[in-house]
């Protein structure tokens, strides 16, 4: 299922429209669509993306995502007791390079919550 984030965009409290989320893709084979978007699609403009996933997702998709991992800075969070809390946010913040221009979350809802929060704090597209 492809979700166009513009369908859910609403003006912020400051009256402006903010578009931090480009697209949400939930379907079998989503990894293939991500690779295509990075090489030929709407994500090709980003030169220094940070991909965040957890150990479960990394293990399950490692072979499929080899090309994507080569194009990104990759942070693999330990899935054991992973929570969207200050500790996880600090791990991401300490790992990030200054030139990160996109954050990609691959995997669980917790990974997405952490990624979305950091992207919002640093005003990086997500």
Predicted regions mapped to residue ranges:
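ATP/NTP phosphate-donor binding region
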Residues: 1-102
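Glycine/threonine-rich beta-strand-loop-alpha-helix active-site module
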Residues: 84-126
